[in-house]
């Protein structure tokens, strides 16, 4: 229902369909007796219904990224995991962290594993307010550590979490450094990741917010330069649109040509630089610009499969 505060998908298996039904109804009976909450349940047993319900979590990020407004759910603390028995305490304390910093955060999770994806709603940061992101991460991770959790439960540590690994692993971090020195003494492999003395690595490589140049001509169609800038800003340059995986469909033209300019992110970068005034807007009337623009036939597979659902067409 639209008034619901949360939803939880629970799957039970059995050797027979009746055994699965009995187990599901035991779960329902248990949660309906919880004090102080109203629980509405829906049972699904056909393959079509089950597949539909399990498809719902896949729609969370696309829906979040398409929400209108100046703020966006930024994925910089989205991979924490805590012991399942500590979930209740952690969620209360995590909400207090967001209240302290006056932000709202989305939340979806793999509850049985204690895996939480939190995305605070913030504007794309400028160099002046980037410190806010680091402060939110630091305060939230302190809560994670205090309940025996990890800041990287499902994905890699990467640049955004490297600065906090020393706090998570303590003296064991020295062993990480020794291993790095043995196998990569010249720091050639993924420099700056996992092993780094930079305390501000989380915000060091942020892509700044683009403010459209005042010299841009007014668009002739029903769009604005602010809208173009916001859409281009959704691209973080991860390169997922260059995938060759057989279970994905983006980007057909890049798969055929293997040219960077054919990739969706190339168009986002091009429009970002034009909007910012780094490139002359008259470039859009050139043959070179048309050649890049023509490397898209509006199939919208990038919008469907991009991690941040950038609508390149």
Which residues are covered by each model-predicted region?
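A glycine-rich phosphate-binding loop feature that marks nucleotide/adenosyl-phosphate handling sites
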Residues: 1, 42-58, 108-121, 153-165, ...
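Flexible, glycine/charged-enriched surface loops at secondary-structure junctions
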Residues: 1, 31-53, 104-108, 147-154, ...
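Terminal amphipathic helices with adjacent charged low-complexity linkers/tails
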Residues: 1-71, 109-111, 195, 256-271, ...
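Short, hydrophobic beta-strand segments
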Residues: 4-14, 68-80, 116-124, 159-167
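Activity-critical C-terminal alpha-helical subdomain
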Residues: 63-67, 71, 168-225, 233
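Extended, hydrophobic alpha-helical segments in both membrane/secreted and soluble proteins
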Residues: 84-94, 101-161, 175-179, 231, ...
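Ferredoxin-type iron-sulfur electron-transfer modules in oxidoreductases and energy-metabolism complexes
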Residues: 201, 206-238, 242-313
